[in-house]
UniProtKB/Swiss-Prot annotation:
Species of provenance: Helicobacter felis (strain ATCC 49179 / CCUG 28539 / NCTC 12436 / CS1)
Lineage: Bacteria, Pseudomonadati, Campylobacterota, Epsilonproteobacteria, Campylobacterales
Gene field: ftsH
A GO molecular-function annotation: ATP hydrolysis activity
Segments on the Cytoplasmic side according to the record's topology features: 1-15, 144-638
Active site positions: 441
An example Gene Ontology biological process: proteolysis
PANTHER family for this protein: AFG3 LIKE MATRIX AAA PEPTIDASE SUBUNIT 2, ISOFORM A, ATP-DEPENDENT PROTEASE
Name of the molecule in the record: ATP-dependent zinc metalloprotease FtsH
Keyword Magnesium: no
Cellular component, GO annotation: plasma membrane
């Protein structure tokens, strides 16, 4: 690359005069000023080139000139009277202040002198009324143009100069700095070998992969993994977001793709990383493009051409891209020869969460009571970024409380903040509402502990959290769930209905607190019918397509079944909800006294642990000589 080249935004490079906004504004201002002065005068353009002089006289002298016929014409304004003399080319303009005089016009008529009226203009009013708005609009236009020029790396006529905005970095991240994605790391380890020893593979006739697509949910470490590959291989790392290629002008995105690959080739071996590639790689068959000249489509076509065009045998350039929406990418982008491999960077399992917590806990001063395995059990389903945030939040909590070490209680509080939201201690609720919340959460807890396939209870609280929750039951599974059996889905429905059922059984009146529970229960049954084939309504037929597994998009937006099928689906959902609701109410009725004890303790302490919930249920069963219905740990969802 030519390091001596100065781009248009180089502070040491001189701008042409006509590109200076202030100079252009001044020029336009002078032109407008001259034009307005000419237009507002009572003389023509021809009179400007004659030799004229102006003389101020009294009104009496003006009348004498008119009476002696020494003026050729008279112009009458609101406050002034102007008269032009008859002295050939050397004319004199006489100006007098007008006074109320009804005899002036008859005098002009009697002397047969031409007269007319003229409007007197105020120069400063003209400036404010005409010149100032024009200059303001012009200034705004020049400001926007200069900003656009900077963003586009040189303006409309300087697309190629965006090269100077593309800088290589040498990441210091290594695979040891990552945890919880061992399978993903194994998939990309050989990419490091390709970059370090390209001749070894070329001598065997092997073709080095041109592209690797990293897919997975948000926050799982896709960007970090790409940097680790470059760090391990010690090669230049060129990173751009997919949206950085798209601009207002068609062709600019394609130009940036060319610039990016040109620079990467000169620095080869190197890595190009495109984050959120779905911004430019959306499928052209999905109806997302406006026309064949759409900016996104041109950018995608250029990317496809570049990945086809560069050779990688001697000087490899490998493209890494990240997305959490692989299902919308263009098939041409995913074919062999472009993105040869897809690597899943998924949420960590229990072991992975422990390792991630260990990585992020290194700079934190810990108390002796910290148990990372317990925290890992409470954080099933969270991504690496969530775990890093929990560690940081725990450190902030300890500092806020003037503690010298981070304790287990700080980590647990940080987990609850991440799952349920910020604790609202200042939110005051009435005793009546507090009672409703206590019964509601107790219902969730009891059904969760007595239903096979549900998650165990870790904590029950009636302290408001987040934007809307007045209480919550924390019952996270110890491990991620990749499959769910039908009885586990039914168990989840029962737990969700436990809150509403408890209100119904103990208070004989229901509230709006169960709205989200009912919505989630309905969605589960809808999925059983339309997607999982777990009902007699549609049998094994899939009625709706799942949208996006990584972003939690739910089920398809378009309905692909008949009105009759829709009616049968609605009937099935309603009947199953009613059936499970009756079952849950009966279970709660059987354990009325246990729930009353739980509610009283919640009123007193506001928080009880999962162990205490199980103790209350066991004590009730022993005192009433009942066979235990508590579900053993191994039969809970884990």
């Amino acid at each position: 690359m030519d390091n001596n080249h100065k781009g248009p935004n180089d502070p040491n490079s001189k701008k042409p005069l006509l590109q200076n906004p202030l100079l252009l504004i001044a020029i336009f201002g002078i032109i407008i000023f001259v034009a307005m002065r000419v237009m507002n005068s009572d003389e023509g353009f021809g009179d400007r080139f004659l030799s004229t002089s102006t003389k101020n006289i009294s009104y009496h002298e003006m009348k004498e000139l008119i009476e002696k016929k020494e003026v050729d014409s008279v112009s009458i304004g609101q406050t002034l009277i102007k008269a032009i003399s008859k002295e050939g080319n050397n004319k004199t303009i006489y100006v007098a202040k007008r006074v109320p005089d009804l005899s002036l016009v008859p005098l002009l008529d009697s002397q047969k002198i031409n007269y007319s009226g003229f409007s007197e203009s105020n120069f400063f009013a003209d400036i404010l009324g005409w010149l100032l708005p024009v200059l303001v609009i012009l200034g705004l236009w020049m400001f926007m143009a200069s900003r656009m020029q900077k963003n586009m790396g040189g303006g409309i006529f300087g697309m190629g100069s965006s090269k100077k905005l593309i800088n290589a970095e040498k990441p210091k991240v290594r695979f040891n700095d990552m945890a919880g994605n061992e399978e993903a790391k194994e998939e990309v380890v050989e990419i490091v070998d390709f970059l370090k020893y390209p001749d070894r593979y070329a001598s065997l006739g092997a073709k080095i992969p041109k592209g690797v697509l990293l897919v997975g949910p948000p926050g799982t470490g896709k960007t970090l993994l790409a940097k680790a590959v470059a760090g391990e291989a010690s090669v230049p790392f060129f990173s751009m977001g997919g949206s950085s290629f798209i601009e207002m002008f068609v062709g600019l995105g394609a130009s940036r793709v060319r610039d990016l690959f040109d620079i990467a080739k000169k620095e080869a071996p190197s890595i190009i990383f495109i984050d959120e590639i779905d911004a430019i790689g959306k499928s052209r068959a999905a109806g997302g493009m406006i026309s064949g000249n759409d900016e996104r489509e041109q950018t995608l076509n250029q990317l496809l051409a570049e990945m086809d065009g560069f050779g990688s045998e001697n000087a490899p350039v490998i493209v890494l891209a990240a997305t959490n929406r692989p299902e919308i990418l263009d098939p041409a982008l995913l074919r062999p020869g472009r993105f040869d491999r897809q690597v899943l960077v998924d949420k960590p399992d229990f072991k992975g969460r422990v390792e991630i917590l260990k990585v992020h806990i290194k700079p934190v001063k810990l108390a002796n009571d910290v148990d990372l395995q317990e925290i890992a059990k409470l954080t099933a389903g969270l991504a690496g970024a969530d775990l890093a945030n929990i560690i940081n939040e725990a450190a902030l909590l300890a500092g806020r409380n003037n503690q010298k070490e981070v304790k287990q209680q700080h980590l647990k509080e940080a987990v609850e903040r991440g799952i349920a939201g910020l604790e609202k201690k200042s939110r005051r609720i009435s005793p009546k509402e507090k009672k409703i919340v206590a019964y509601h959460e107790s219902g969730h807890a009891v059904i969760s502990e007595m239903t096979k396939g549900s998650a165990r209870v870790n904590k029950v609280s009636i302290i408001p959290r987040g934007m809307a929750a007045l209480g919550y039951t924390l019952n996270t599974p110890e491990e991620n769930k990749y499959l769910m059996q039908k009885h586990e889905l039914i168990a989840e429905i029962d737990v969700l209905l436990g809150g509403r059922a408890a209100e119904d059984v103990f208070l004989q009146e229901i509230s709006t607190g169960a709205s989200n529970d009912l919505e989630r229960a309905t969605d589960i049954i809808k999925g059983m019918v339309s997607y999982y084939g777990m009902s007699d309504v549609s049998g094994l037929m899939v009625l709706e397509k799942q949208r996006n597994s990584f972003l939690g998009g739910g089920f398809g937006s378009g309905r692909e079944f008949s009105e009759k099928m829709a009616e049968e689906m609605d009937s099935f959902i309603k009947n199953l909800l009613e059936e499970r609701y009756v079952h849950v109410k009966q279970t709660l009725s059987d354990y009325k006294d246990a729930i009353e004890v739980m509610v009283n303790e919640l009123f007193e302490k506001e928080v009880i642990t999962g162990e205490r919930v199980r103790e209350i249920i066991s004590e009730y069963e022993v005192s009433h000589n009942l066979q235990t219905r508590l579900v053993p740990l191994e039969e809970h969802a884990s």
